Swiss-Prot record:
Key words of the record: ATP-binding, Glutamine amidotransferase, Ligase, Magnesium, Metal-binding, Nucleotide-binding, Pyrimidine biosynthesis
Disordered: annotated span: 552-571
Annotated protein name in UniProt: CTP synthase
One MF annotation (Gene Ontology) recorded for this entry: ATP binding
Natural source organism: Trichodesmium erythraeum (strain IMS101)
Start and end residues of each Glutamine amidotransferase type-1 domain: 306-548
UniProt xrefs under Pfam families: CTP_synth_N, GATase
SUPFAM superfamilies referenced in this protein's UniProt entry, alphabetically: Class I glutamine amidotransferase-like, P-loop containing nucleoside triphosphate hydrolases
Misc remark: CTPSs have evolved a hybrid strategy for distinguishing between UTP and CTP. The overlapping regions of the product feedback inhibitory and substrate sites recognize a common feature in both compounds, the triphosphate moiety. To differentiate isosteric substrate and product pyrimidine rings, an additional pocket far from the expected kinase/ligase catalytic site, specifically recognizes the cytosine and ribose portions of the product inhibitor.
Catalytic activity: UTP + L-glutamine + ATP + H2O = CTP + L-glutamate + ADP + phosphate + 2 H(+); L-glutamine + H2O = L-glutamate + NH4(+); UTP + NH4(+) + ATP = CTP + ADP + phosphate + 2 H(+)
Organism taxonomic ancestry: Bacteria, Bacillati, Cyanobacteriota, Cyanophyceae, Oscillatoriophycideae
Residues reported to bind L-glutamine: 368, 396-399, 419, 476
């Protein structure tokens, strides 16, 4: 029978519930157990597809085309398991389903209420994940914080769930904050005590406490929380701040999280195999140019590669989370250090690409929507093309590459995307035919996994080493085939198309060290242990460029309008 783990959060939001869920999934999988992870989000949106990246961060797309919370990306990367639309549930989708049932008469005239109709629908969604994949364990993360009004139906549903499946088949983990108060010179457990008290007031007694803190908990503090929160001391787990999220599974393994979970669920204790994950973390942390011994021999870290991501949502780095993680995976595999620069596309418009990109070894233009910053992205493509800097365009990044070529090489007057200029005389990017009559924005794009046929003897084919690939998409606009012959005549290579040849999926330039752009999102399929080949080869090309000093930034102050943020791996 499938076992169920529920992860709640207290004290503050963004405390790391998703990483705890993903880490526990990795620890269980390392013991040979199959795992599926579900996210319950309390917002009323049906899905995050129409939400602003500034508020919500990245929209992660599953193979079956669901637009989901970015935590599903963590789940997939940590467990190396593909999730589906069943693994992402919002309160909006729950209410939508219940209201649709009421309109059909499914409730036979009964009064529809939060209890039992909403809570029953929530429980059914959890059971649906178990029935679909039949995993050994379903881990469910409840979004938000205990005490939020929005979370109450979810908390009531999981309270009932233990009674439904019997006690030994359900486990409650509460992730909470134990802050260090500098003025007092000590850590304070009172916020955790109050958070657990709030949870217990609605009928949920946590079995395990995962305590987020910036230093290790003393045994005395663990005993204190054990006493006040009615949790065995061995089930009080330290989750200390880490340089990289990929270290967290190893930290939680040392603290005994998986052992406690298996014991409480009455499951067999098995020896974990985390050797590959430990090797990955070792590669990540050895930044002192020393040799690392691996199963393949000796790996030397000898360089730092400067990568610039030119985007329009850089104020919130989570807006490009999967792109950043894919770059980290590539850096680990190539064996070099990554220095990452997030550049505001609007700044490129006003100050020029050279100001921000002169010392970049590689440039990425990621996806996005809307006209804001588009000229900065197009200027970035031109700079990368002319200066022979390795370039990777993703979704909108490919469309910008097409527009740049149309204007500067094909000499098409005022060439643009129909999305940004419906009056353009040369719409080199046009609306997909099936999108012509679409009115609703949510869930109506070309979404999910689609096949792509590669042309032989191209950079794309050399990268993938296979004729047909499958990649995840999220777009409404596409290359306009009316211009396909002109682009080929002027030197463009269309190296990937849909199997019927109708849709352009990959473009590249031959006389360039590495210039390739895709209509799809390869970042969604990159894994720590198996980096995506496009990111891997892009990073190798960037590594082969002449190494330069750190990226120059001429800004005198950091504001939301001119921000250039930097982060280095590990992060």
């Amino acid at each position: 029978m499938t076992k169920f783990v529920f992860i709640t959060g207290g004290v503050v939001s963004s405390i790391g519930k998703g990483i705890v869920a993903a880490s526990l999934g990795r620890l269980l999988k390392s013991r040979g157990y199959s795992v599926s992870i579900l996210k319950l989000d309390p917002y009323i949106n049906v899905d995050p597809g129409t939400m602003s990246p500034f508020q919500h961060g990245e929209v992660f797309v599953t193979e079956d085309g669901a637009e989901t919370d970015l935590d599903l990306g963590h789940y997939e990367r940590f467990t190396d398991t593909s999730m589906s639309r069943l693994n992402s549930v919002t309160q909006g989708s729950i209410y939508q389903a219940v209201i649709n049932k009421e309109r059909r008469g499914d409730y036979q005239g009964g009064t529809v209420q939060v209890i039992p109709h909403i809570t029953n629908e929530i429980k059914e969604r959890i059971h649906r994940v178990a029935k679909n994949a039949n995993p050994d364990v379903v881990i469910t993360e409840i979004g938000g914080t205990v005490g939020d009004i929005e979370s109450q139906p979810f908390l009531e549903a999981i309270r009932q769930f233990r009674k439904d499946v019997r006690r030994n088949n359900a486990l409650y983990i509460h992730v909470t904050l134990v802050p260090w108060i500098a003025s007092a010179g000590e850590m304070k457990t009172k916020p955790t005590q109050h958070s657990v008290k709030e949870l217990r007031s609605i009928g949920i007694q946590p079995d395990i406490l995962v305590c987020r803190c910036d230093r290790k908990l003393s045994e005395g503090l663990k005993e204190k929380m054990s006493e006040f929160c009615d949790v065995p001391v061995e089930s009080v787990i330290t989750s200390q701040d880490a340089q990289s999220i990929y270290e967290v599974p190893l930290m939680l393994e040392t603290e005994g999280l998986a052992v406690q979970a298996l014991e409480l669920l009455k499951m067999e204790q098995r020896q974990p195999n985390l050797s590959h994950w430990k090797t990955l973390v070792n590669r990540l942390y050895h930044r002192d140019k020393q040799d690392i011994r691996t199963s393949q021999g000796k790996l030397s870290i000898t360089a730092t590669v400067e990568i610039a991501i030119v985007g329009k949502y850089i104020q919130l780095s989570d807006a490009y989370l999967s792109v950043v993680e894919a770059l980290r995976h590539a850096a680990i595999a190539v064996g070099v250090d990554l220095n990452l620069h997030l550049v505001n596309a609007e700044d490129v418009e006003t100050k020029g690409a050279r100001t921000y990109l002169e010392k970049a070894n590689g440039i990425i233009v990621p996806g996005g929507f809307g006209v804001r910053g588009i000229d900065g992205k197009i200027a970035t493509v031109e700079y990368a093309r002319i200066n022979k800097i390795p370039f990777l365009g993703l979704c909108l990044g490919m469309q910008c590459a097409v527009i740049e070529w149309a204007r500067n090489i094909a000499k098409l007057d005022a060439a643009h995307s129909f999305e940004f200029d419906p009056q353009t005389p040369n719409p080199v990017i046009n609306l997909l035919p099936e999108q012509q009559d679409v009115v609703d924005l949510g869930g109506t794009m070309r979404l999910g996994l689609y096949p792509c046929r590669l042309q032989g003897d191209t950079l794309a084919f050399k990268t993938y080493q296979q004729e047909v690939i499958y990649e995840r998409h999220r777009h409404r606009y596409e290359f306009n085939n009316a211009y396909r012959n002109l682009f080929k005549e002027t030197g463009y290579i269309i190296s990937g198309t849909s199997p019927d040849g109708r849709l352009v999926e990959i473009i590249e330039l031959p006389a360039h060290p590495f210039f390739i752009a895709t209509q799809f999102h390869p970042e969604f399929q990159s894994r720590p242990s198996t980096p995506h080949p496009l990111f891997h080869n892009f990073f190798q090309a960037a590594n082969s460029q002449e190494k330069c000093d750190n990226l120059s930034v001429n800004n005198t102050e950091e504001t939301p309008d001119n921000l250039v943020s930097k982060s280095s791996i590990p992060n």
